Structure formats: structure tokens, C-alpha cells
């Protein structure tokens, strides 16, 4: 059975059982900025599972395109790993649970092929259930599985969870016995090569708390609603039904591999009989080509284009690995024009848009190959020379400088250098490479600071520094002082005068102004020089040792050599200092609760507020966040002395002062300690005692990237004002609801529940209105070239799922033996949309819903051959869309 047919049967089975067919989300994880790609079938439904949004349907089915990026380096080395895959899934949002999910899965798996099922032998299916899930065990018994083929497994294998806190619950997996030629008998506990897992049914019913690993966490209670999330790997099922060993042998992948073998003159599996080798370089490279070309096709098809960052870099890396692999197999010409059309033909049965959009996809793919071949030619020559020189010198590692030159000058990726060196039995000085990269980033950071001050060229700053030496910062001890103007930058020349209205950069010999750095915002204030005065707008350190004041001349003029009086905004300084000390306390307290891995990844110390980024593998539970906040404020109440002192780096480490990962420190460092509570290396300004902070209020905790979390908080009077506003709000709500303050939350929840119930009732009424005329419309179907055609506009206000439901309802009321096409147009928000539904009898005559929609929308729109939709035209075009579909049928 072909992969596309398995896909179709899966969707049809669940659609027939009341599930809405939901199209795959695009591969880029657009809805989650913390992820590059969708990696699971349930990701587009996460807001529904978490209760953040109300699902527009109670049950859904989809085939989701997924990408697994951690496997890139393993792809090809075994026949088990691939990057792109498809995940069949059926989902319930508070509708059905185990008693329906298990029979639905069993029915599709075991129903004969000629009856629309997958035709698996029921005697070869082994379900697993969670240890104490007697309910699931009994349901499996009720569908006919003998007790000795139902395996109970522990939390690590059969209990699923997502997020902390988050939903969790037991799961039940279905394994298929591939036969004695694949291993020992005895079920999945004995041999998971012979017994292949092909479907996982997750029963979400509990909420989990914080913990470590797959087993060590508490169950906090029941979820408000029980949900179902299942996943069947489409490629895995295809390998079972097609009687092949792995995904590289199925019909959507093997033709690409075969084409690569044809081009290179290699035979897949030639080195180990009829079965492909797991380790022979030829078979490894053929698998790399097959997987990566298919993945590149799907990524570009979903809008990703090659680049040097994010998703585009993943695509570039995948394409370059495929291109280099086929060149190592002996093919020296352009490979993408030969391979990409084969991948398109393999995948377009399920994704017809790949065929219609192939011109654009090919343009990007072919251009990327051309660019890489140029890079490869230049870089390979340099690398070959480096390899030869390394061997001649008797060394085992290519220098970091050479790897950096390849990367920086020739655009040769470091991962490719590492891979080629490994193939030649050599290593690469990765530490030296990283050090040179860090130096380059530091230079880029300095240039960015210079651009912020308006000077891309740092030479003027270096000249001032060389002529007068470093600027002395006195801001730790004083907030104002007499200073001499050393340079005026941004005027006609470094030694010219700045006049009223000009914005320039001033360099003083000494200054109390703190330059932005270490997450702390700069001081602001005024400088009075003779009869003139300037307002300091920003303070930066574009090159180490030189403090530059960006300032606007308010009156008079400022000349080099004049003596003036520099005075910072003390209210701002005190507010920033409070925030900075608070950040130290938050950092230490996070480590107290989360462990030493909770290291700082970034910060912002601004007047009255702070932002603290830290590394941690998991989120922070609300209860932990409350404890952190309480402990921080207890440190304020203790009124601990804040002390700063300079010592050696070795001594600072000995006394346990925290240093920021990646920062460079000199031999002498400044340590800031808050009593015995917190101790860090820090160059910022702080309060004298912790009690001066007044109050710290944590506002939020969120993810800003993989393994990086962010806490935001208010400090001092800003925290007090926030709580005062919150108090007034609660008091106002209590007054409106006429209840005590501690009952406001309960009353709000009741109101929200009532609103949701009312929305559900409105949804039911709207559905009744929309579907009420389905029977009459079906009875009025016209005849177009032997096809029953219904073209109608949906009732006013109907949109989205309502229109799809109406089209399917009309289709279901037409005699299934009669070819039928239903087109329903709708008008909403000034736009016209169209849903087309086609029954199997019409499909057998070559009619496709997706094709008809593309005709109506000039190539746009999408969906399956049975159900498709499009939109975006002006509302007045709705009748014309119906006529276009009718004309397309007439001309078919």
C-alpha cells in the first residue's frame, strides 16, 4: 500500500467518525518563536490542550509535516534516522477518551484492506499500557486482544507529559510483530526491533508538577477536561505495510535513493548482500542524499529559504550535506536538477502544491547548489592543503586558525571541516576555532557600540585614547565632579567647538557617568562648561578604557581643554542601582531553588525594573517563582550590607564569587557581595544595603529560547505602585461583584464559564442554521456532465469550520453511487472564500477538490482531493467562484 494511500485512509477513517480534517501546519513553527520547526503532530493544537483557546471542533484528524533537527548528523549512519517525517494523529478536546480512542485505533489497524482499513494481522499486534491503567487494559481485552499480548510498562515508557506544570497522562502504544527473522519472540519488552511501535495513544487527564527525568515528578491533580492525542508515524506504517525494513525503502524515499545510485553508478546494498549496510560509506551517503533532498524540497515548499541563520541555516546545512555526499559518491555535476524532480514526484500525490510551486522551489535549490559548489571548490583546495600540511608535520589536528580562515574567508562551514577531517582520521582544534570566533564577535560588538554612538569607524576613538590614555571613572565614589574636556567628536574636527543645538560626543579626563555595560543602563545628567551646558543623552565605551558621553548642547558652546562640572541624574542612578542589586539577589535565589545550572545568560538593569535571563533545562513552576520572590524580599528585610571590593581573579573564585560564562576577566576583578547571601564579579553600581531596595515584585517568567528562561520584575517604588494599582483593581471588582476581595477570582471564573457556555450555545444555534438547509440543497443538485453539482452560498455570518461542515453535510446527503461535487462560497470581512467537497464516485472520474479550488483561485488554495478551500478574493466574487467550479466540471 502506497504511503499516500495510507495517509488517505487514515484521514477518511477518522473523518467518517466525526473528526474535522485539519490541514498540516507549515514546517516552520511560526506560532512558537522558541522553536524552529514543528516536530510533533499535536503542536498546532497545543493552545487547545492547554486551555488557552477554545478549539473550533471537538475532535480532529491531521497528517502533520515534521522535522527533527537533532538527528541531522546521524542521518545516513543508520537506517533508523531521518529528518523529515509525517505524523498521522487524531485528537479529542474534551470529547471522547480511552473507551473510544482504543477501538478507533484497533478498527483502522485491523480492518481488511478491501473494507478501507490497513489490514494488519490482529494476532501480531501487541498493545502496551501504563502499569496501573486497568481501564485501558480492559478496553484492549474488549476489542479482542488476549491478556498475554497486553504489556504493562512503567512511567518512563508509558506515561507522557508536556511542560512544567503541564498536562500529562498514561499512554498506550501499539507494536507490530514483524516475525522471527527480525529477532526474539516475547513482545516489546524482549525485542523492539522485531516488535515495531507504530502508534501511540496518549490519554491526557492529569497535571504534573516540577521534577527531573521521565519518572521523578508529582501528579498535581486532574485536568479540567480529558483529551486524546495520538501519533502514528506515517513512514513507519508504510515500511510495515510495504514489507520493507525502514523508511529508506518506502515508496516516497526509495526512488530518490535509486536515482542517486543511478547517477553515481553505485548499487545500494552491494557491500552486504541484498540488505543495505549500516556502515559502508556508499550506503551511508546514498541515505544522506535521499533523506536530505526530500527534506529540502519540503522546507523550501513551506517557505524556508537558505540563509546563514535560524531555519534557513538548517536548510543550507541539509542541502550542503546532500550535495557533498553525492560528490563523494562520484557525481561531479549539478545534482539538484536530477534529484529534486524525483522527490517532487514522490511527494506530490500527498502535497500537490509541490508540483504547482516547483518552479520557485527549484530556483532556490539550484541557486544554493551553485553557490555551494563554488564554496566547495575554493574551500576544499585550502582544506586539502591543510590536511597534507598537518600530516607532514606529524600533527593529529588541523589548527583552529585554519578552520577559522575556511569559515571566515571562504564561507566553509565548521561542521563540514569537522566531518571531512574526521573522514581523513584527523581532528580539528575546535577550541582554537571557538576562541577566534569569540574574538570576532567581540570586535563586532564594539563596532555595534560605535554605530550606536554614530561612529562606525573606531579610529577617532582610538586616537583620543592613545593621546590621553584611559578615562578615569569616579562614579563608584561620587555623583558629580569637576572635569576637563579632552575631545569633542562629531563636530567639524576632534578639536572644534560644539555650539548650541548640536549633538556631539564628549570625552572627559575623569567622569562620574557610568557607561552602559554588564546589563546596566547608562547614567544621564548634565555637564556645565563655562557659560554653556550640555544634556547627556547616552554614555558608551566604544573601545576599552574610553568613556564617551553623547550630549546635546543646550546653551553656549563647549571647547576642548575647558573645565566643567559633570553631574549625573541621582534619582535615575539610585533606581538603576536598586535594580542591579535586585538582579544579583534574583540570580542567587534562582540557583538556590534550581541548582547551579541556573546561570545568568543576560540581564537588563533599568530604573525601577529588571530583566534576568538564565539557563535552565525546564520552566519554573509558579509555586517555585513565588518562593523565589519571597526569599528575595526576605533578603531585603534582613537589610544586608552590600560591599564591593577589588581582588585577584583567583581569590574571587576561591571565595565562590559567580562569574558570567563567556566573559573575559583580567587578573584583578571587582566583587560585589550582598551579606553572605550573594557574591558576583560585577562592574556595576549598587545600593549600600539590601533594605534600600524596598520591594521586589516578579511579574513574569517565560522562555526566550531553547534552555533559556527570562524573569521580569519591578523594584522599589515601581513595585509598590504596581501592587497599589492591583489592589485598587481587585477592590473595584469586589465592589462590582459585591463580594469580599478574596472571592473575586471565584466570581470571575464563574463569569467566564457562563460566557463560554453562552458561546457554545451560540455555536450550536449557528450550526443548526447553517446545516438546516443541507437536505434541500442536496435534493436540488444539478447535473453537469454526469456529475451532481451543488453550488451555493453559505448563510450570512457563516465562515471557516461552518462552511466546511455545510459542504460535507450536503455531500453526505447525495447518493454515494452518484458522482458529486459540492461548492459552498461564503462572504466574511469583505472577502470571499470557497470550500469544495468531492465524493469518492467523483474522485474515480478524475475530479479533485484541490484542483477545482486552484482553478477558482488561479493556482492558490489547498487541501485534499476530497476537501479543499481557498479565499482572499473580494466578497463580490463569491457567485463567480461557484460558476468557475461548475464550468471546470463541465470542461473536465
Curated annotation (Swiss-Prot):
GO BP, one annotated term: alanyl-tRNA aminoacylation
Compartments where found: Cytoplasm
SMART domains: tRNA_SAD
Keywords of this entry: Aminoacyl-tRNA synthetase, ATP-binding, Cytoplasm, Ligase, Metal-binding, Nucleotide-binding, Protein biosynthesis, RNA-binding, tRNA-binding, Zinc
Entry remark concerning the domains of this protein: Consists of three domains; the N-terminal catalytic domain, the editing domain and the C-terminal C-Ala domain. The editing domain removes incorrectly charged amino acids, while the C-Ala domain, along with tRNA(Ala), serves as a bridge to cooperatively bring together the editing and aminoacylation centers thus stimulating deacylation of misacylated tRNAs.
Pfam families documented for this protein: tRNA-synt_2c (PF01411), tRNA_SAD (PF07973)
Protein name: Alanine--tRNA ligase
Catalytic activity: tRNA(Ala) + L-alanine + ATP = L-alanyl-tRNA(Ala) + AMP + diphosphate
Record CDD domains: AlaRS_core
Binding residue positions for Zn(2+): 580, 584, 682, 686
One Gene Ontology term of the molecular function aspect: tRNA binding
One GO CC term, this protein: cytosol
Enzyme class: ligase
Role: Catalyzes the attachment of alanine to tRNA(Ala) in a two-step reaction: alanine is first activated by ATP to form Ala-AMP and then transferred to the acceptor end of tRNA(Ala). Also edits incorrectly charged Ser-tRNA(Ala) and Gly-tRNA(Ala) via its editing domain.
PROSITE patterns reported in the protein's UniProt record: AA_TRNA_LIGASE_II_ALA
HAMAP family per the UniProt record, alphabetical: Ala_tRNA_synth_B (MF_00036_B)
Family: Belongs to the class-II aminoacyl-tRNA synthetase family.
Listed InterPro entries: aa-tRNA-synth_II/BPL/LPL (IPR045864), Ala-tRNA-lgiase_IIc (IPR002318), Ala-tRNA-ligase_IIc_anticod-bd (IPR018162), Ala-tRNA-synth_IIc_core (IPR018165), Ala-tRNA-synth_IIc_N (IPR018164), Ala-tRNA_ligase (IPR050058), Ala_tRNA_ligase_euk/bac (IPR023033), Thr/Ala-tRNA-synth_IIc_edit (IPR018163)
Amino acid at each position: 500500500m502506497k504511503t499516500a494511500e495510507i495517509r488517505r485512509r487514515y484521514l477518511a477513517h477518522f473523518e467518517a467518525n466525526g473528526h474535522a480534517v485539519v490541514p498540516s501546519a507549515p514546517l516552520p513553527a511560526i506560532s512558537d518563536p522558541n522553536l524552529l520547526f514543528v516536530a510533533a503532530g499535536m503542536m498546532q493544537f497545543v493552545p487547545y490542550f492547554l486551555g488557552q483557546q477554545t478549539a473550533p471542533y471537538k475532535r480532529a484528524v491531521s497528517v502533520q509535516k515534521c522535522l527533527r533537527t537533532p538527528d541531522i548528523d546521524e542521518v545516513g549512519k543508520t537506517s533508523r534516522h531521518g529528518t523529515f517525517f509525517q505524523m498521522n494523529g487524531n485528537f479529542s478536546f474534551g470529547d471522547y477518551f480511552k473507551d473510544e480512542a482504543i477501538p478507533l485505533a484497533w478498527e483502522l489497524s485491523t480492518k481488511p484492506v478491501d473494507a478501507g482499513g490497513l489490514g494488519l494481522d490482529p494476532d501480531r499486534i501487541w498493545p502496551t499500557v501504563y502499569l496501573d491503567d486497568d481501564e485501558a487494559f480492559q478496553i484492549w481485552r474488549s476489542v479482542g486482544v488476549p491478556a498475554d499480548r497486553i504489556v504493562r510498562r512503567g512511567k518512563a515508557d508509558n506515561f507522557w507529559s508536556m511542560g512544567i506544570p503541564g498536562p500529562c497522562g498514561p499512554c498506550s502504544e501499539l507494536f507490530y510483530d514483524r516475525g522471527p527473522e527480525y529477532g526474539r519472540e516475547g513482545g516489546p519488552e524482549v525485542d523492539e526491533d522485531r516488535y515495531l511501535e507504530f502508534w501511540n495513544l496518549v490519554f491526557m487527564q492529569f497535571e504534573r508538577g516540577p521534577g527531573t527525568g521521565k519518572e521523578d515528578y508529582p501528579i498535581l491533580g486532574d485536568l479540567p477536561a480529558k483529551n486524546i492525542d495520538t501519533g502514528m508515524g506515517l513512514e513507519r506504517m508504510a515500511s510495515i505495510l510495504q514489507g520493507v525494513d525502514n523508511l529508506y525503502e518506502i515508496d516516497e524515499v526509495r526512488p530518490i535513493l535509486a536515482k542517486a545510485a543511478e547517477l553515481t553508478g553505485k548499487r545500494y546494498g552491494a557491500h552486504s548482500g541484498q540488505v543495505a549496510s549500516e556502515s559502508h560509506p556508499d550506503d551511508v551517503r546514498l541515505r544522506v542524499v535521499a533523506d536530505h533532498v526530500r527534506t529540502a524540497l519540503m522546507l523550501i515548499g513551506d517557505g524556508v529559504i537558505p540563509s546563514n541563520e535560524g531555519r534557513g541555516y538548517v536548510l543550507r546545512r541539509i542541502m550542503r550535506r546532500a550535495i557533498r555526499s553525492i560528490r563523494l559518491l562520484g557525481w561531479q555535476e549539478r545534482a539538484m536538477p536530477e534529484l529534486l524532480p524525483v522527490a517532487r514526484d514522490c511527494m506530490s500525490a500527498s502535497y500537490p502544491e509541490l508540483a504547482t510551486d516547483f518552479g520557485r522551489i527549484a530556483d532556490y535549490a539550484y541557486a544554493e547548489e551553485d553557490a555551494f559548489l563554488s564554496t566547495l571548490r575554493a574551500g576544499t583546495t585550502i582544506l586539502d592543503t591543510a590536511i597534507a600540511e598537518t600530516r607532514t608535520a606529524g600533527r593529529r589536528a588541523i589548527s583552529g586558525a585554519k578552520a577559522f580562515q575556511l569559515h571566515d574567508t571562504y564561507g566553509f562551514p565548521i561542521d563540514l571541516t569537522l566531518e571531512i577531517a574526521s573522514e581523513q582520521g584527523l581532528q580539528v582544534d575546535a577550541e582554537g576555532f571557538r576562541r577566534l570566533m569569540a574574538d570576532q564577535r567581540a570586535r563586532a560588538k564594539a563596532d555595534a557600540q560605535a554605530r550606536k554612538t554614530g561612529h562606525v569607524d573606531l579610529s577617532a576613538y582610538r586616537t583620543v585614547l592613545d593621546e590621553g590614555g584611559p578615562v578615569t571613572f569616579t562614579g563608584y565614589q561620587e555623583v558629580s565632579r569637576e572635569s576637563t574636556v579632552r575631545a569633542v567628536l562629531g563636530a567639524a574636527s576632534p578639536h572644534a567647538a560644539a555650539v548650541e543645538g548640536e549633538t556631539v560626543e564628549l570625552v572627559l579626563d575623569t567622569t562620574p557617568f557610568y557607561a552602559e555595560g554588564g546589563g546596566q543602563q547608562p547614567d544621564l545628567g548634565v555637564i556645565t562648561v563655562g557659560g554653556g551646558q550640555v544634556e547627556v543623552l547616552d554614555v558608551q565605551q566604544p573601545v576599552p578604557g574610553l568613556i564617551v558621553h553623547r550630549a546635546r548642547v543646550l546653551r553656549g558652546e563647549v571647547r576642548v581643554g575647558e573645565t566643567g562640572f559633570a553631574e549625573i541624574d541621582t534619582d535615575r542612578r539610585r533606581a538603576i542601582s536598586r535594580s542591579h542589586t535586585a538582579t544579583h539577589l534574583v540570580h542567587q535565589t534562582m540557583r538556590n531553588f534550581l541548582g547551579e545550572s541556573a546561570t545568568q545568560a543576560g540581564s537588563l538593569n533599568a530604573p525601577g525594573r529588571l530583566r534576568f535571563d538564565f539557563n535552565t533545562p525546564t520552566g519554573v513552576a509558579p509555586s517555585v517563582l513565588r518562593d523565589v520572590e519571597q526569599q528575595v524580599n526576605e533578603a531585603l528585610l534582613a537589610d544586608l550590607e552590600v560591599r564591593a571590593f577589588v581582588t585577584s581573579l583567583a581569590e574571587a573564585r576561591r571565595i565562590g564569587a559567580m562569574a558570567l560564562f563567556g566573559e573575559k576577566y583580567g587578573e584583578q576583578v571587582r566583587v560585589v557581595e550582598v551579606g553572605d547571601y550573594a557574591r558576583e564579579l560585577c562592574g556595576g553600581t549598587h545600593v549600600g544595603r539590601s533594605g534600600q531596595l524596598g520591594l521586589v515584585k516578579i511579574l513574569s517568567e517565560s522562555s526566550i529560547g531553547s534552555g533559556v528562561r527570562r524573569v521580569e520584575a519591578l523594584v522599589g517604588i515601581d513595585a509598590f505602585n504596581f501592587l497599589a494599582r492591583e489592589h485598587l483593581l481587585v477592590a473595584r471588582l469586589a465592589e462590582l461583584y459585591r463580594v469580599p476581595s478574596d472571592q473575586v477570582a471565584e466570581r470571575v471564573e464563574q463569569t467566564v464559564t457562563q460566557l463560554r457556555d453562552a458561546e457554545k450555545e451560540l455555536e450550536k444555534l449557528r450550526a443548526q442554521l447553517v446545516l438546516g438547509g443541507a437536505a434541500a440543497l442536496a435534493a436540488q443538485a444539478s447535473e453537469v456532465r454526469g456529475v451532481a453539482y451543488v453550488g451555493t452560498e453559505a448563510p450570512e455570518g457563516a465562515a471557516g469550520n461552518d462552511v466546511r461542515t455545510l459542504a460535507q453535510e450536503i455531500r453526505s446527503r447525495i447518493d454515494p453511487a452518484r458522482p458529486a461535487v459540492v461548492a459552498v462560497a461564503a462572504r466574511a470581512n469583505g472577502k470571499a472564500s470557497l470550500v469544495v467537497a468531492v465524493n469518492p464516485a467523483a474522485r474515480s472520474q478524475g475530479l479533485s477538490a484541490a484542483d477545482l479550488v486552484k482553478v477558482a483561485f488561479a493556482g492558490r488554495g489547498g487541501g485534499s482531493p476530497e476537501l479543499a478551500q481557498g479565499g482572499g478574493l473580494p466578497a463580490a466574487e463569491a457567485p463567480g467562484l461557484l460558476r468557475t467550479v461548475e464550468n471546470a466540471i463541465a470542461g473536465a
